[in-house]
């Protein structure tokens, strides 16, 4: 039973796998030297809205001996149950709440800006989730016992990483991979490492799909498009995200 946030839940997943493979180094599963075919049932009680590990098929571990941080996706990673009471997240420090908010947004954005975009409903779900998180996040930070804001963010955390926001497309988790390297080397909180990378990544790739960045900016930030080029709107969208993350401290 995991009681905590994403790191605690992911650790419990690793322990559950390790119980079935006592003769092996658990890291061999994460480096795919061993194919996982079974696990021990585990559940979670969530105390931080962030990674969505309580409903996801992924788990991330850091090897402190090698300085590596790696993710593993497998159906065996999904917990048997998750108890999600927003009141259990009230006491988390604001910095951790902010990092969790960033992770939720990134889990959705890295699916939204995938190469294949073949499902409109998936887009609508992702856009609704992003808009809700951006709306509720400052309330959550400024009102530490606001039940509605905390429940919305907690719900979004699960939806952002159970793959409902990525149905019908492949995922591009390049920002997460860069973030893992930063976290492993500098012991940075996961969400913070992602915000350090995302805007540079976005400015590097936005011309691959300028229209998509424009579309998202209009929906999320009501960007005034009068007499502006698509490129200008796309870059404004990226800047709005930067300013949002900065506002969360």
What spans do the regions from the language model cover?
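Alpha-helix-centered segments that form part of catalytic cores
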Residues: 84, 239-242
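Active-site segments that bind and position negatively charged phosphate/pyrophosphate groups
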Residues: 111, 115-240
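Short, intrinsically disordered, charge-balanced linker/junction segments flanking boundaries
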Residues: 241-249
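A glycine/threonine-rich phosphate-anchoring loop and its flanking beta-alpha core
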Residues: 20-121, 215
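Short glycine/serine/threonine-rich phosphate/pyrophosphate-binding segments
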Residues: 7-13, 52-55, 171, 175-176, ...
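N-terminal small/polar loop signature for handling phosphorylated ligands or for N-terminal nucleophile
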Residues: 1-24, 139-150
């Amino acid at each position: 039973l995991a009681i905590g946030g994403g790191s605690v839940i992911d650790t419990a997943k690793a322990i559950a796998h390790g119980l079935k493979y006592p003769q092996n180094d658990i890291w061999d599963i994460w480096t795919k030297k061993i194919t996982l075919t079974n696990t021990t049932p585990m559940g979670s009680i969530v105390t931080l809205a962030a990674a969505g590990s309580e409903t996801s098929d992924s788990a991330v571990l850091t090897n402190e001996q090698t300085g590596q941080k790696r993710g593993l996706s497998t159906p065996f990673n999904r917990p048997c149950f998750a108890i999600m009471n927003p009141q259990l997240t009230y006491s988390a420090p604001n910095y951790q709440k902010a990092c969790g908010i960033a992770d939720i947004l990134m889990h959705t954005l890295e699916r939204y800006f995938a190469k294949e975009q073949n499902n409109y409903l998936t887009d609508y779900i992702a856009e609704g989730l992003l808009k809700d998180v951006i709306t509720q996040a400052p309330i959550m930070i400024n009102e530490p016992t606001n039940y509605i804001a905390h429940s919305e963010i907690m719900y979004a955390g699960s939806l952002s990483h159970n793959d409902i926001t990525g149905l019908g497309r492949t995922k591009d988790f390049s920002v997460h991979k860069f973030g893992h390297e930063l976290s492993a080397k500098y012991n940075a909180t996961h969400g913070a490492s992602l915000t350090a990378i995302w805007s540079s990544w976005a400015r590097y790739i936005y011309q691959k799909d300028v229209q998509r960045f424009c579309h998202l900016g209009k929906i999320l930030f009501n960007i005034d498009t009068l007499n502006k080029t698509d490129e200008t709107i796309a870059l404004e969208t990226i800047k709005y995200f930067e300013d949002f993350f900065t506002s969360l401290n």
